[in-house]
């Protein structure tokens, strides 16, 4: 039995949980932990340049691997700087444990230097939070925190550690618990047998069924089960933004992404379907448009591990609470007993007609560089094998629509909170987790400046990623909305004083390249990928057409079938 200080217990607990990397920034309240990182060893710490970036790095690490991302920050501003990243992970159901320092127990509530109520501030955006009151409780609290973060619907958990709990003079027996029990927490993983059978009967009788898959498929590692199930019933599959890669984008049954900027065929198929089999989704407002007009003839079958997500926005006719992987396995077994399954020939014919609209067409003859062309060229050169992170805005939507994701965990983006500044640190987290992977961050001139300081972190740890900056000298999505909804009044959506990104990147010790014409686009991309393969971080600053908009775009207040397409309204 080991006798350890609180700080040493923290490191030993991380090791026992199999944690190899943590992301953080030191400060007074956590200096004992930082000392233990040296004396105990066994965990690699990545020193970021801002605590928000630490959370995004841990987030990218978690999304690309399915492992838990771990963050270490000090009290006060260190903790509050992490809030945006915690909220980002919470909205997208990403497993994360955030260890925050706190002032000494005797000072809590007295407005001490760098004191803040991290438990209270984070409460709405975490699965759970712990304030450690006794040093000897550290092992069991850590085990509970990691269990909570990774089970049921995953999400972030905060552990707040007062400074006195960590002191070297405060030593206790380190007892690692074999088992834990958390009162009132027992996630349902096995779906109700009767509900599953009922849902399958309805789905097999449908004439216009559609499978709507989301990020829950990726979280539960059930992409293969989804593919097998979809093939057995020959049903079209659409995904949410978070679900891209859950079903192969190159599969004949894929009709791509639905929602505000989803494809014409996906949105039309949803609207005119008679049965929607929704699995691992929460019917976010960006995927439903006007709820009063939502899929008026569809019976809703909703599978989710989180019971609070079912019928929260769209009422489910057949609710199934359970793990997506287990439910799909059960359905696959039940289907084996079916003698005949509908061909859905007429339904596929309708979808084929919607596909002929070619909603993703754009002006390929333009003299200006089109963002669509950049993403398509990137896909061609990488053959779809890369891990792609993005920031938030037009470039995010262009990437989602024009880069074909055929495997899960290859698309890393802030879908729920929509956090600008996410892309670069997330890419660094992915690269740390998967050193041999090709990691590419697609960003814009607005987003990249939110956390551009992490180019320094990349240099310190030799994290080679490719950054594509789609530079239109404006906040593209804001400008698009101003064009389409605010009569073209561009209020504060232009970037008039951008830095010379190439020189800035070079000052951090990386390679910067500029692209101004269509003729040099592919050549520079090939060069950038070559330099990347040689172990360099490469920043490609691409001057794109600043008038380009993302289409399709659903009409506010309309049904799923009402959208703007190639600058004209269709329905």
Swiss-Prot record:
Q: Where does FAD bind?
A: 153, 261-282, 304-323
From the UniProt record, which GO molecular function terms apply? acetolactate synthase activity; flavin adenine dinucleotide binding; magnesium ion binding; thiamine pyrophosphate binding
**Which cofactor(s) does the record list?**
Mg(2+); thiamine diphosphate
Q: Which PROSITE patterns match?
A: TPP_ENZYMES (PS00187)
Q: Which reaction does it catalyse?
A: 2 pyruvate + H(+) = (2S)-2-acetolactate + CO2
The entry's protein name is Acetolactate synthase large subunit
What species was this sequence derived from? Buchnera aphidicola subsp. Schizaphis graminum (strain Sg)
Keywords of the record, alphabetical order, are:
Amino-acid biosynthesis, Branched-chain amino acid biosynthesis, FAD, Flavoprotein, Magnesium, Metal-binding, Thiamine pyrophosphate, Transferase
């Amino acid at each position: 039995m080991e006798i350890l200080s609180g700080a040493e217990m923290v490191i030993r607990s991380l090791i026992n949980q199999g944690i190899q990397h943590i992301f953080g920034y030191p400060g007074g309240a956590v200096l004992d932990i930082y000392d233990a990182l040296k004396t105990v060893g066994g965990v690699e710490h990545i020193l970021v340049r801002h605590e928000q970036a630490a959370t995004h790095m841990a987030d990218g690490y978690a999304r690309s691997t399915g492992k838990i991302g771990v963050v270490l920050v000090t009290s006060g501003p260190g903790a509050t700087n992490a809030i945006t990243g915690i909220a980002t992970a919470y909205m997208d159901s990403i497993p994360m444990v955030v260890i925050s320092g706190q002032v000494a127990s005797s000072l809590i509530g007295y407005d001490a230097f760098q004191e803040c109520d991290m438990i209270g501030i984070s409460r709405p955006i975490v699965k759970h939070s712990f304030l450690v009151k006794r040093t000897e409780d550290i092992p069991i609290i850590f085990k509970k925190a990691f269990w909570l973060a990774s089970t049921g619907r995953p999400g972030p958990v905060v552990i707040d550690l007062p400074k006195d709990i960590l002191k070297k003079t405060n030593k206790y027996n380190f007892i690692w618990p074999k088992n834990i029990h958390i009162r009132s927490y027992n996630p349902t993983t096995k779906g109700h047998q009767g509900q599953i059978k009922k849902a399958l009967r309805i789905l097999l009788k449908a004439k216009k069924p559609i499978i709507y898959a989301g990020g829950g498929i990726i979280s539960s590692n059930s992409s293969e089960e989804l593919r097998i199930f979809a093939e057995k019933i020959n049903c079209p599959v659409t995904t949410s933004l978070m679900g891209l890669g859950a079903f192969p984008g190159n599969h004949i049954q894929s009709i791509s992404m639905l929602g505000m900027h989803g494809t014409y065929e996906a949105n039309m198929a949803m609207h005119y379907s008679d049965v929607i089999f929704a699995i691992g989704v929460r019917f976010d407002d960006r995927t439903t448009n006007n709820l009063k007009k939502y899929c008026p003839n569809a019976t809703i079958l909703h599978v989710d591990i989180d019971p609070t997500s079912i019928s929260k926005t769209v009422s489910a006719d057949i609710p199934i609470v359970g793990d997506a992987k287990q439910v799909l396995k059960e359905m696959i077994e039940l289907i084996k007993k079916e003698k005949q399954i509908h061909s859905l020939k007429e339904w596929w014919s309708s979808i084929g007609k919607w596909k002929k609209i070619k909603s993703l067409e754009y002006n390929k003859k333009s003299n200006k560089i089109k963002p669509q062309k950049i993403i398509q060229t990137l896909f061609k050169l990488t053959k779809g094998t890369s891990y792609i992170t993005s920031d938030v805005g037009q470039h995010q939507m262009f990437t989602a629509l024009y880069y074909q994701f055929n495997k899960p965990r290859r698309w890393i983006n802030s879908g729920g909170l929509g956090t600008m500044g996410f892309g670069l640190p997330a890419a660094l987290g992915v690269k740390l987790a998967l050193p041999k992977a090709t990691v590419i961050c697609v960003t814009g001139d607005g987003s990249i400046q939110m956390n551009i300081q992490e180019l320094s972190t990349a240099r310190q740890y030799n994290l080679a990623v490719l950054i594509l900056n789609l530079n239109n000298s404006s906040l593209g999505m804001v400008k698009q909305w101003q064009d389409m909804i605010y009569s073209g009044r561009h209020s504060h959506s232009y970037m008039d004083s951008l830095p010379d990104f190439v020189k800035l990147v070079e000052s951090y010790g990386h390679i910067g390249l500029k692209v101004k014409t269509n003729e040099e686009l592919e050549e520079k991309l090939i060069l950038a990928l070559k330099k990347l393969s040689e172990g360099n971080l490469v920043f490609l600053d691409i001057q794109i057409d600043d008038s380009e908009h993302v289409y399709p775009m659903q009409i506010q207040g309309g049904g799923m079938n009402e959208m703007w397409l190639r600058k004209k309204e269709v329905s």
